[in-house]
Amino acid sequence: MASPAQPAATMAAFARMVKGQVRSYSAPVDMAIPASKRKFIPSSGSYPKGFVVSGTHVGVKASNTKFPDLALISSETPCSAAAVFTTNKFQAAPVQVSRDIIKTRQGQGIRSVVINSGCANAVTGKGGLEDAVSMGKKVDECDGLNEPSTLVMSTGVIGQRLPISKILKKVPVAHANLSSTHDAWLTTARAICTTDTFPKLLSRTFTLPSSPGRTYSLAGMTKGAGMIHPNMATLLGVLCTDAPIEPSALQSLLKHSVNRSFNSISVDGDTSTNDTIAILANGAAGGAPISSSSSDDYAAMQDILTSFAQSLSQLVVRDGEGATKFVTVRVQNSPDYESGRLIASTIARSPLVKTALYGKDANWGRILCAIGYTQGVAPGTVVPEHTSVSFKPVDGSPVLNLLVNGEPEQVDEERASVILQEEDLEIVVDLGGGEKGEQGLGGEEAVYWFCDFSHEYVTINGDYRT
């Protein structure tokens, strides 16, 4: 594959702004990255061996006249691949095509992922499926491959056909510009953005127990700011590693990590037609392949991948449409993980909780209400007289108790106001009445991340197609 140097993705290119416009409204446009978000954009990275990427301008949406909206992520050698997809019944064409490719290839021999922003290619019938197939096939042709080896993703407005001729014309350009530089990775992450205010890219190095002297790398990019809720939302993500992992192990590793990361975030409670998180592992760094779930390497990789996916998914919440708060809800002393996750999810989805946090109102009754109406939890999970709720400040100061063992506390409203002025907040729900396991509930903990609802969220989504 060609790997020419890619033009530097400068901050200036991201910092220009259309007058009066805050977000990109389903296709990249001139926009300013909020000062508070610039700290999340990496200035360098540690990227996996054998992977090259590019971001290319197509103009999928007519209003985008110059910014990259076609992303290509490729490995110079065949990869193991795994993916998780949306549970929405109206699954977009690229979701159907990518799912079939992974199934047919049994997670082996995948080389690339191609992604367009600006059009979701969802609810587009037979023609949409043909378009998705043709996108992947064009990449395969550039690689000289005869078998389907490219996963396809799309994001943007639902119900519109892709300008497929424009896209196919630019795929060879994207392929020719493939590069391994940090600027290339950042430009590629920008190419998948829609209403995002900043590109979301992370990378890290790690070691495995079987090869403590060998360094591996893991990189990931994601997009999403609205229509975000688990079981996947307008949320796309691609993870790449040069560690050697067999397909069956890779699928179970990804599922575990996604359940505790991308499936544990919420912006607005809506689940998209296009959600996909995929991971490619090319083994370019060498070492023994991870194949058994009972191995030390598997356990280590599970922790590494889960932690990485959590950090990546949290960037989506921090960029939630109109968000002013990043909220962690921690449910403790649940009889099982899933019951705790359901309670955390219900709190995170509650419009009343989200608007109270935006208004800096310590209205803990709304949190308690959400706990009480949570569906699907194990019997006996929620016992009012054993339940406690508190705010945990990010500055390390003592928690502010709101409810203890079912009894309301005399809340210091002034201190509550100070805590709620901060961008970050943690809500702790203890189902066991205090100390872990005190009520014999098993001590399981589930964590969820969400943001508040503001006036801007309504404005952004009211104007989405304009």
Curated annotation (Swiss-Prot):
Pathways per UniProt: Amino-acid biosynthesis; L-arginine biosynthesis; L-ornithine and N-acetyl-L-glutamate from L-glutamate and N(2)-acetyl-L-ornithine (cyclic): step 1/1; Amino-acid biosynthesis; L-arginine biosynthesis; N(2)-acetyl-L-ornithine from L-glutamate: step 1/4
Q: What class of enzyme is it?
A: transferase
Q: What is its EC number?
A: 2.3.1.35, 2.3.1.1
Q: Which reaction does it catalyse?
A: N(2)-acetyl-L-ornithine + L-glutamate = N-acetyl-L-glutamate + L-ornithine; L-glutamate + acetyl-CoA = N-acetyl-L-glutamate + CoA + H(+)
| Marked site (Cleavage) residue numbers | 233-234
Q: Which UniProt keywords apply?
A: Acyltransferase, Amino-acid biosynthesis, Arginine biosynthesis, Autocatalytic cleavage, Mitochondrion, Multifunctional enzyme, Transferase
The Gene Ontology biological process annotation of the record reads:
L-arginine biosynthetic process; ornithine biosynthetic process
Give the family per the record: Belongs to the ArgJ family.
- Designated name of the protein: Arginine biosynthesis bifunctional protein ArgJ, mitochondrial
User: To which species is this protein native?
Assistant: Aspergillus flavus (strain ATCC 200026 / FGSC A1120 / IAM 13836 / NRRL 3357 / JCM 12722 / SRRC 167)
